[in-house]
């Protein structure tokens, strides 16, 4: 990783190489990797690198101050642990501080019984946020001397600085989240805690020995200060001075109440009972009130290093750790809060040594999750740089591992200090008050969705039910208000729905043409070729470009639909046609085609105000009713008795007149009389 000069790129590369979880495919800052030279991303990287350089310098100054101010000797008893003699304790902790650059042979990874008890600290103050961020993420099998603050571990760190990360095969290995948790237990209040050994303060800057399978730290010359320049926790929005002051004040307030305790030695799970340092969960620091915790230890613990600054840990080969014991915990569900900048790294959940955690915590807990190499892998929070600022509850499954590490004895060798415990301890973890960082701007999709939602709400509020006209026949949505209602061809439309099928212009209040189920404006209908599908007049044969009149299944121009006799327009007037499809008005039709009376020779027309024609048919002739009478006496003839018709030589007579006419004639003609 020496080819990267920019710390931002170094951190991004390191995140991708972590085998604890899958790195974000969009990169560290929620930016598409294929986007190229994004000016916003370049500016963010520049600011990030500048802040990290400042944190390096402040960290060195604080470490030098810690080495000068913290005494080496006064240590309190371990909470719940056994006591050793002063000579043994100085061999464990004090002797490691006198060695300068001496490299000890690596120790084999320890294995522990599954029934071991977890050592929990009672009041160990944590590191400030700057120190916690300066600690590197370590996972994989660790080998090396148990050095708490000396420069012994730098030799091993420099040798393994360029090794690629490998899978964690040892259950006692640390995840980067565990490393943060342990770090929060070792920061004393500067100048106010004489009982804390320099080994605790120096554990921040010391190079932790790592095997070739561990994550690569940055190399540093042996002559330099033990503080390694490995800023891999991304915390660009945090002010180092403010965070340090807040942490120190919180530690000083509790220094008189609780003695300094041990770290929790549950393999890769480190729990801080004192004031917490910022934990990084799901890409965001958890924010909440700071509360002290009082962990309950299930059984007395036999520890090889009873000093308060001993910092017992169960991992073999981690600098600054002494003896520790293991236990199997049942991890209760913990609240996981997401807040602050999205560039933080989520802590991987520990799984090798279980520890019972109280589920009713009032703050956020350090990252807990599955760890490679364990038998039972649980699911834990992943890296989530794009997560929103909302609290999220994450239920952690019960994590277990087959093996637990042995504790370290005072002479640096493995000691069998495992104890059985009938129950798992429970620890309350506090909230971490952090300064929230800059929010990421919402994406374009989120902005569009918000705009659509607001538009729908405004439309629902703006249209009362009283203005509802009905449903649009085109979009099937309700039509509210006269301003958007449009009625055409007996149907209801939105004015935005009733548009030209060719140019999509609104047709409300304009001339339109309905052709084959579509409506067109006049311009598109006349000049775009749509007139080829228009109807033609049955009489003149021309295209009907204006109003159309349909009659008898045929289409006509209104001006062409006229009576052939009087030439009057028959639009809206009763009409009829003859066998030759000639159009007549009713009056002219009867005049031309009505039957004529055989008596008077006039056409038999229907009476005024009626369409029915009344006529009398006699001797295959048509007569008006008033023309059907006796020619001699004028008697009206009909079918009644005494009024019957007796024709004679095509003349109409009643019976008496008919007899008279016959008497005047010769008798020969009487044989040919007819009665009608």
UniProtKB/Swiss-Prot annotation:
Residues 54-134 are annotated as: Mediates nuclear export. Residues 201-213, 232-242, 343-360 have a biased composition (Low complexity). Residues 472-676 are annotated as: Necessary for nuclear localization. Phosphorylated during mitosis. Residues 470-531, 535-595, 595-664 form the LIM zinc-binding domain. GO terms for cellular component: adherens junction; cytoplasm; cytosol; focal adhesion; nucleoplasm; nucleus; P-body; plasma membrane. Adapter or scaffold protein which participates in the assembly of numerous protein complexes and is involved in several cellular processes such as cell fate determination, cytoskeletal organization, repression of gene transcription, cell-cell adhesion, cell differentiation, proliferation and migration. Positively regulates microRNA (miRNA)-mediated gene silencing and is essential for P-body formation and integrity. Acts as a hypoxic regulator by bridging an association between the prolyl hydroxylases and VHL enabling efficient degradation of HIF1A. Interacts (via LIM domains) with TRAF6. Found in a complex with TRAF6, PRKCZ and SQSTM1. Interacts (via LIM domains) SNAI2/SLUG (via SNAG domain) and SCRT1 (via SNAG domain). Interacts with SQSTM1 and RB1. Found in a complex composed of LIMD1, VHL, EGLN1/PHD2, ELOB and CUL2. Interacts with EIF4E, AGO1, AGO2, DCP2, DDX6, LATS1, LATS2, EGLN1/PHD2, EGLN2/PHD1 and EGLN3/PHD3. Interacts (via LIM zinc-binding 2) with isoform 1 and isoform 3 of VHL. Interacts (via LIM domains) with SNAI1 (via SNAG domain). This is LIM domain-containing protein 1.
